[in-house]
Amino acid sequence: MSVSNDLIWQVIRDNNRFLVKRPEFGGIQFNREPVNVSGKNAQRFSGLCNDKAVGVQANSPRGVVLITKTNPKNAQKPAKLFRKDVIANASSRKTYKSIAGRIGRTGYRDDLVKVSVARASAILSSQRPKKTVA
């Protein structure tokens, strides 16, 4: 017996392990899930209630790691639940094209392509060496 994604979201939206509430900023809620590409606490981005979810994280020296959820049959096997693809030391445009290809053109989650590319862009710009004033 499976439970619908909408019902799961109704249960976890106000209380889960990854939720970060900021009452001093008007009650805004963020999310620290590894497969939440935007960091917003919204059903569209949540990896807990969607069968297909995308995450973009920094790779240690340079580059990004693209995390996607695999088949929902692996829900009881945490080691097989996520697929991690390392996109390392490529130019920015190649990285963006690779992310767009793996998420959008394959039909995985077309709605998360722009958000994923923006997240990768922010990560890559933070990894660039800082310019020094001579």
Curated annotation (Swiss-Prot):
Record GO biological process: cytoplasmic translation
GO cellular component labels: cytosol; cytosolic large ribosomal subunit
Gene3D superfamilies per record: 3.30.390.110
Alphabetized GO MF terms: structural constituent of ribosome
Family from the record: Belongs to the eukaryotic ribosomal protein eL28 family.
PANTHER family: 60S RIBOSOMAL PROTEIN L28 (PTHR10544)
Known partners and oligomeric status: Component of the large ribosomal subunit (LSU). Mature yeast ribosomes consist of a small (40S) and a large (60S) subunit. The 40S small subunit contains 1 molecule of ribosomal RNA (18S rRNA) and at least 33 different proteins. The large 60S subunit contains 3 rRNA molecules (25S, 5.8S and 5S rRNA) and at least 46 different proteins.
Phosphoserine modified-residue sites: 60
Annotated compartments: Cytoplasm
Organism of origin: Schizosaccharomyces pombe (strain 972 / ATCC 24843) (Fission yeast)
Superkingdom of this protein's organism: Eukaryota
Protein name per its UniProtKB record: Large ribosomal subunit protein eL28
Pfam families: Ribosomal_L28e
Protein's job: Component of the ribosome, a large ribonucleoprotein complex responsible for the synthesis of proteins in the cell. The small ribosomal subunit (SSU) binds messenger RNAs (mRNAs) and translates the encoded message by selecting cognate aminoacyl-transfer RNA (tRNA) molecules. The large subunit (LSU) contains the ribosomal catalytic site termed the peptidyl transferase center (PTC), which catalyzes the formation of peptide bonds, thereby polymerizing the amino acids delivered by tRNAs into a polypeptide chain.
UniProt KW keywords: Cytoplasm, Phosphoprotein, Ribonucleoprotein, Ribosomal protein
Keyword Acetylation: no
